Amino acid sequence: MIEIEKVCVDFTAGRGTPTRAVDDVSLHIAAGEIFGIVGTSGAGKSTLLRTLNALTRPSQGRVNVNGVEISALDGKALRQARQRIGMIFQHFNLMHTRTVAQNVAFSLKAAGWERSKIAPRVAEILTLVGLADKANRFPVQLSGGQKQRVGIARAIANHPDVLLCDEPTSALDLETSATILALLRQINAQLGITIVLITHEMNVIKSICDRVAVMSGGKVVESGEVFDVFAHPQHAFTQQLVSHTLNLTLPERLREHLPGQLLKILFIGDSAEQPVLSEVAIKFGVAVNILHGKIEYIGERALGILVVQLTAPHNPTAVAAAVEHIRQRTAQVEVIRG
């Protein structure tokens, strides 16, 4: 579906030294998947996204969409290719003097639709995004979430193959963000549209994406299935993002003063639902104190992370045996202290 091959993007201000915003990025995005690109501000993710519809041209490398090298197109050929690629934005980009229906109809008129077919399509797509009763409202009369729904309706009205999402929830509150992400999942499942989404929030990636690329300093430092990236982050930057998202940092006071061993335990799949710690307490006679933890469901797979304290003041070898038992029954054990 989408092939990004060794893409670099340089920006030059005046006669200054070029700044490399995207540095040698190669990615394959399969048809029908929801692919996330995550990174902090300045990581290059927005610039990379804009190469997919040639709003930004690569300085080096190629971008192919549906077998067509879009980075090499211009004029009429580029306009035709862009009709197969919808895009939504962080700040909605609606025309404030036009109604909801007129905003959606505009994209169809620009694509050359017959006048008689525009109104039925607008009604159909507004029903899909839950705005059938808002067709004659103006953007100023809408909430932020409703404005983004108009943006989505406009972007998918022309039956695109690809939907590019540039920070689609960053201007919204948590509850509204969840409804927008649910709508994007519905559109992906119902219409089969490939979605490429950029965000600075790993929670967004966790809730909607099939695969993810992590960007830092213009480079993709890690990529893979979302569950695997959360369960086994390889790059230090990814580890930082995941740790912040799962919020498993212990106060230093606890790390320094609690007796016994402190462990961070990763449970994957079935092991997340097994009574491993109860077994340890009974079998080895150790005291188990759960300090922090949670079980996340990413897709349909469980990922459990616990921070626990193990103590057995009168039988130190029991703690070591308990740790080994936990290692055998879980995916990963990290000794934080002890």
UniProtKB/Swiss-Prot annotation:
Enzyme Commission number, as recorded: 7.4.2.11
Superkingdom in the source lineage: Bacteria
Key words of the record: Amino-acid transport, ATP-binding, Cell inner membrane, Cell membrane, Membrane, Nucleotide-binding, Translocase, Transport
Enzyme class at the top of the EC tree: translocase
Main location: membrane
Kinase recorded as keyword: no
Keyword Cell inner membrane annotated: yes
Gene Ontology cellular component list: plasma membrane
InterPro entries the UniProt entry points to: AAA+_ATPase, ABC_transporter-like_ATP-bd, ABC_transporter-like_CS, ACT-like_dom_sf, MetN_ABC, MetN_ABC_transporter-like, NIL_domain, P-loop_NTPase
Reactions it catalyzes: L-methionine(out) + ATP + H2O = L-methionine(in) + ADP + phosphate + H(+); D-methionine(out) + ATP + H2O = D-methionine(in) + ADP + phosphate + H(+)
Amino-acid positions noted as binding ATP in the UniProt annotation, renumbered to this chain: G39, T40, S41, G42, A43, G44, K45, S46
Localization (cell): Cell inner membrane
Topological type in the membrane: Peripheral membrane protein
Subunit structure: The complex is composed of two ATP-binding proteins (MetN), two transmembrane proteins (MetI) and a solute-binding protein (MetQ).
Name this protein carries in UniProt: Methionine import ATP-binding protein MetN 2
Organism whose genome encodes this protein: Salmonella typhimurium (strain LT2 / SGSC1412 / ATCC 700720)
